[in-house]
Amino acid sequence: EGARADLTKALSMNPIFQVTHAFTLGGAGKNAYNFGAVYGDEKRFYQAGLDDAGNVTMRLNRLLFPGHISKIQAQFAPAGGQSFVQLEHDFQGSDYSMNFKALNPSPTNLTGIYVANYLQTLTPRFALGAEAVYQHPSPEIEEATVGYMAKWVGPAKEWIATAQWQPQGIAQLTYWHQLSE
């Protein structure tokens, strides 16, 4: 009913550099081709892909200096309305972490979605945090919210529990437990 082939060639191991060709022939869907490339070392990771419809995807992560990582994710599509860009920066301090994110930011009319997170460790097993979200999808629409979270860690770090609350009345509880090594 069809065939699929993925051909990957590692051109270098340090830094890592590889290319991939993926083919799909016949079957229920149409024939398809995708080209991908990956490059990375201890400070950067770059990944990109191009398909036969002209869609380009990319992901770039860059360690600027200890504790600071900048990230870019994007998709560019020939069909209107399907492209997006996400810009992000993580900072990991000794007892806190911060993250800033912009989704489809526009410098001309300041539209987009902007998110800031902060998590502060209060004891070795307990942390509190907040998330601010500013949504401005079009010049006529604006909305800002602030949510809160708490994180508890087991004495031997064998479990993690979190609680999150958003002002729209949304609450979320999570629990993770390590069962074995």
Model-derived features: where do they sit?
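Repeated loop/turn-to-beta-strand initiation elements of outer-membrane beta-barrel proteins
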Residues: 43-46, 67-72, 93-100, 124-130, ...
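Transmembrane beta-barrel domains of Gram-negative outer membranes and organellar outer membranes
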Residues: 1-105
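Outer-membrane beta-barrel translocator/channel fold
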Residues: 75-89, 99-115, 132-146, 166-169
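Residue-identity detector for threonine
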Residues: 8, 20, 24, 57, ...
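Feature captures outer-membrane beta-barrel proteins of Gram-negative bacteria and organelles
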Residues: 33-40, 56-65, 85-94, 114-123, ...
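Non-transmembrane, interaction-prone segments in cytosolic or luminal domains
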Residues: 52, 60, 71, 119, ...
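Glutamate identity and glutamate-enriched acidic tracts
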Residues: 1, 42, 88, 131, ...
